[in-house]
Amino acid sequence: MDEIRILAPTGACGSGFLESSFEKGLSQAPHFIGCDAGSTDPGPAYLGTGKPAFPREAVKRDMRLMLKGARRLKVPLLIGSANTAGGDVHLAGLVSIVREIAAEEKLSFRMAVIHAEQSKAYLKKRLGEGRIKPLHPAPEFNEAVIDRSECTVGMMGAEPFMHALKEGAEVIIAGRASDTAIFAAMPVMNGFPEGLAWHAGKVLECGAAAVVNRKTGDCMFAWIRKDHFVLEAPDPELQCTPQSVASHSLYENADPFKLVECSGTLDLTNSTYEQISERAVKVSGSEFIPAERYTVKLEGAEKVGYQSVIIGSIRDPFFIRQIDDWTERLLVRCHARVKQVYGERMKPGDYHINIRIYGKNGTMGPLEPVKEITTHELCLIIEVTAPSQDEASSIAGIVRHQGLHLPIPEWSGLITALACPYNPAHLDRGPIFRFN
């Protein structure tokens, strides 16, 4: 085999792609179709709750097109990180969609289902053997962390996909997986240079993200050869350039030249990018450095508590000029009132109040380089986190009332400072999670 052709319909199953682009990609005779279906990008809630980031209907639409296309061409379909987080419940949800489509479309195929969720007993065993260590700058990892986790998954590399392909799988639905591994598996097992396979996979896993100006989620096509690979989006309106492809290595990476995978590191130091047509780019020189020890990244999510949120705006210029002092005084007043209401039943460490000020530094917090407030209004998002939803809601009610009437020296009499667009003013978010 001198060339392997790959079609990536979109960067996330459920985010959509153009049917016209997909049909054009199919007409170029791919050897397989691959699609990433998850990520840690949406946050820990999906791993913690077992829910997907995209609606079931959206995922089913994308899966139907991909399944029908793959079976029409009789080529494998590879899906990784099922239903966002890739735990067992996510995997089962996507498999059920696949089975529904197969029944509705009267499709028959050999399917491999690859699990990624890790049991607490297994993790504790490996921890005791010294086989687990925290990734910098993660905090200490111990049995307590394992016990607090709602779900823990291991991010698999290319090998499980390779094994399934060798066993004759025509459709592969995998739990949490390296996005890139989905696309690197078949080229590597067919003897193509690992550097080129992994680099092409890094671009393909985001669909059409490596074009100059992506208008919507869409397809990307790659031709991997022995000394280079070529990228071109099937949509004739989309253009790949050396800059658009090279700059994609900055996406989601601290180091744009060294990208770490389970089995080694993709090294782009000597990669070259060449415009070979108006819309296509040729890439060569990428290398893959095998790891001394194979590693699997663990991802876990634990429940922090329950949360209620208050959204309010402030437009008084006297108020805006002293917003930092006012929010500090508000927190003091709120904590004092919570103590009055709950006494020893609710200590300061049991709950948390956080205030984000949009129009000042709501996005970047203390990292915001612009210190002067020039806007005529501010938006405050006040988060209350507590052990239960009832407690979070109750404390949010306290915060709302304290914020409405907390005075500044320039005021005379009772004046309302905070304008809340919703009634009730607080929104209950339910359980919230963090990666651990």
Map each language-model feature to its residues:
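Short glycine-rich or small-residue beta-strand-to-loop segments that form or flank ligand, phosphate
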Residues: 7, 52, 75-86, 171-172, ...
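N-terminal glycine-rich anion-binding loops that anchor highly charged ligand groups
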Residues: 27-45, 68-73
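Gly/Ser/Thr-rich loops at beta-strand to alpha-helix junctions
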Residues: 12-14, 39-41, 82-92, 176-182, ...
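C-terminal non-catalytic interaction/assembly regions of soluble proteins
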Residues: 294-436
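An acidic, phosphate/nucleotide-engaging active-site surface
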Residues: 119-174
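Hydrophobic or amphipathic alpha-helical targeting/insertion segments
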Residues: 75-80, 84-87, 91-107
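Short, conserved secondary-structure transition motifs
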Residues: 108-126, 358-360, 419-429
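Small-residue-enriched flexible segments
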Residues: 2-9, 16, 34, 76, ...
